[in-house]
Design a protein with these regions (language model features):
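Conserved alpha/beta enzyme-core scaffold
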Residues: 1-312
């Protein structure tokens, strides 16, 4: 018996009538290229999935499985914070991920690209418990190569699939239309974001509207205030309306288009550190910048981050 545990099984849109199919065919060809439909997903939609294959999904495309009891019962209600835990509970013994690649032969490097978190955590969990796990990387040359923490050596995996058939167009749905209501909500959201804060944006028109509103706030402050005042009959006291002098830190499981625009606009630029004590000192303003001063050393000493005074 095969149990597939995955986030989202995406298939190209199909028309339900001859007219719909004629309309969609050129659009689908342009947007999705040679993206292959997942056979198990097609069988699931048609209610023809073999009984020895079970699919558990922790995300589902809205409306795809209306009236499909088997697919609905296979849904796992979770979020990315707990995905690795909930996948391990399913008793998995193989993890496979599409990866980006750079170089050839001994110089080959792989990148878990835009979705590295789950695989790393699953591998760590299984290694800590001494449980067997076959790790498979499938190279897709069209995946974006993300560096730093997402970059790994091929030796991390037990199997690296280099079949050219695995290189295909990525699934990229068109952006949803941003409505006036979306923009209004985005403006309100942008007025709640503190300079020096942390930002998470999801997929969809609300995220796009919020990103645009943050850019307007930073670049066109007077216009931002004027529009916000028209939406707030009780005034904008207590709202965040100034430009981003310190910048924001972007923290999200999704690298959405709005994030890219905020990076290009210089708004997402705040650096953070993988040290809770050091980061708290920075957040509290006890360490102002990267210049090491006597005040910096005193703050580190008082916090226990430096364990003994330094002498000349």
């Amino acid at each position: 018996k095969l149990r597939i545990v995955t986030a989202l099984s995406l298939c190209k849109p199909q028309g339900h009538s001859e007219l719909e199919r004629h309309f969609l065919e050129p659009l689908v060809a342009r947007l999705f290229g040679d993206y292959p439909d997942l056979e198990y997903a097609l069988d699931s939609r048609a209610g023809k999935r073999p009984p020895n294959i079970e699919v558990r999904e922790f995300f589902m495309k809205t409306g795809d499985y209306l009236g499909n009891a088997a697919a609905q019962q296979g849904y796992i209600s979770t979020n990315y914070t707990f995905v690795a835990r909930d996948m391990a509970v399913q008793g998995m013994n193989v993890i496979a991920q599409a990866v980006a690649a750079r170089g050839e032969g001994e110089d080959l490097r792989l990148s878990l690209s835009s979705n590295p978190d789950v695989t790393f955590e699953v591998i760590e969990r299984y290694a800590a418990r001494g449980m067997p796990l076959l790790k498979v990387a499938v190279i897709n040359r069209k995946m974006p190569f993300m560096p730093n923490g997402a970059e790994v050596a091929p030796s991390m995996f037990d199997v690296v699939v280099t079949d050219p058939a695995a290189t295909h167009t990525l699934f990229g749905a068109p952006n949803s239309k941003v409505t006036p209501a979306d923009y209004a909500i985005g403006l309100h959201a942008a007025s709640l974001v503190e300079d020096g804060g942390t930002l998470q944006i999801g997929i969809g028109s609300l995220g796009d509207a919020s990103a645009q509103a943050l850019i307007v706030r930073d670049r066109h402050g007077a216009e931002f205030r004027r529009i916000l005042e028209s939406l707030c009959p009780d005034g904008i006291a207590g709202r965040e309306v100034d430009r981003f002098d310190r910048g924001l830190y972007g923290c999200s499981e999704m690298f959405v288009n709005g994030f890219l625009r905020l990076i290009e606009a210089g708004i997402i630029r705040r650096e953070v550190f993988g040290d809770a004590v050091l980061q708290q000192l920075i957040n509290d303003g006890r360490i102002a910048d990267e210049t090491v001063t006597a005040k910096t050393l005193r703050a580190l000493l008082d916090a226990g981050r430096v364990r003994s005074p330094l002498g000349a």
